[in-house]
Each structure stands twice: as C-alpha cells, then as structure tokens.
C-alpha cells in the first residue's frame, strides 16, 4: 500500500526556523511583567503555574514566575517548555499556584517543529474562530488575534488572551470545521 503525504494545512507544515525565535513572545512577556498582570503558564506536560512574571531573561529564553509581582519566590520557566501563556484579567478569580521548575520544564513530548501559520492566518482573515488540539489532550477554542512562525494569539470566550506555542500543538482547525 502506498503512503500518501498529508497536504492538510490543519496539521501544519515543517517549521522553517529552528530553534524557535521567541522575540515576538518576549515583547508580550515584558509587557505582562511591567504591568504586573497575572498569568497562567501551562507547560508541554500540562503542569500549571498561576502567578506573575517576576523577571525575564530573553537571552536565555527564561521566565522567572512568582506568587507576587516582582516577587522573590521564583520558579524558572524555559520558553522551550511553555505551551500556553494566558493573561488573566483583573476580574478572574484565581488561586496562585507554583510547581517545581523541574516538573514544569520536563519535556514529556517531542516538539512538533510544525508551523501552523497558514491555517491561523486564514481563520484570522475570514473572521472565524479556531480550535487548537494540544499534544497533551487539551482542546482550546477562540478567535485568533495574530500569528507568527512560532505561536498564535487567541482571545477566549471569557475574554482572556493567550499565546499558544506551536511546538505543543497536534492540529489546528477552524471552529466551524466538522469531520
């Protein structure tokens, strides 16, 4: 039996740039840090840190998360392990939670090295929502706010804004897509 190549943009294309260029994400991280906006960080293995960005080192692709803005109790978060960066609104009720860095940064899955720019850009231009299937099983839905080679911005139904890293995505479809 012949093996056919999948030509479906919802499964992404091979990334042109590797390792990833996090410069666009770095700008967002700095904004969140300077404005003391609470965040939810989700790792590639579904571990969650809810707190603040206390410090950011763009040269090392490293976020230091804390339970307080500019706090001293810091957990190292490697951008290479980050699946989702969600901005929490001031109206959100949330519990601060920190997990050990070695558990958060543990790479349970191999990075996909896939680029989902085409499907995200198409949904953005058509004004339709997207549905994101994460490698660890979570399914996210929302409206795309922009896309680049390594992540997509998504506004969720509760109004929160998140950045979803392509390396931990298995598929992206439009929200109106039905199999």
From Swiss-Prot:
UniProt-listed InterPro entries: Flag1_repressor
Keywords assigned by UniProt, alphabetized: DNA-binding, Repressor, Transcription, Transcription regulation
Function: Transcriptional repressor of the FliC phase-1 flagellin.
Protein name: Repressor of phase 1 flagellin gene
Disulfide bonds: none
Membrane-spanning residues: none
MF annotations from Gene Ontology: DNA binding; DNA-binding transcription factor activity
Pfam families, A to Z: Flag1_repress
């Amino acid at each position: 039996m012949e093996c056919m190549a999948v030509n479906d943009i919802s499964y992404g294309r091979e990334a042109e740039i590797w390792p990833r260029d996090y410069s666009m994400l770095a700008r967002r991280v700095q904004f969140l840090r300077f404005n003391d906006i609470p965040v939810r960080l989700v790792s590639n293995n579904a571990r969650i840190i809810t707190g603040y960005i206390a410090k950011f080192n763009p040269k090392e692709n490293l976020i230091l998360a804390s339970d307080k803005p500019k706090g001293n109790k810091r957990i190292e978060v490697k951008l290479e392990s980050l699946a989702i960066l969600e901005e929490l609104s001031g109206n959100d009720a949330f519990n601060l939670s920190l997990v050990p860095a070695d558990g958060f940064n543990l790479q349970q899955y191999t990075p996909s090295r896939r680029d989902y720019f085409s499907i995200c850009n198409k949904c953005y231009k058509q004004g339709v929502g997207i549905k994101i299937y994460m490698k660890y099983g979570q399914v996210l839905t929302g409206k795309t706010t922009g896309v680049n080679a390594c992540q997509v911005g998504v506004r969720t139904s509760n109004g929160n804004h998140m950045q979803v890293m392509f390396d931990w995505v298995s598929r992206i479809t439009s929200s109106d897509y039905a199999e």
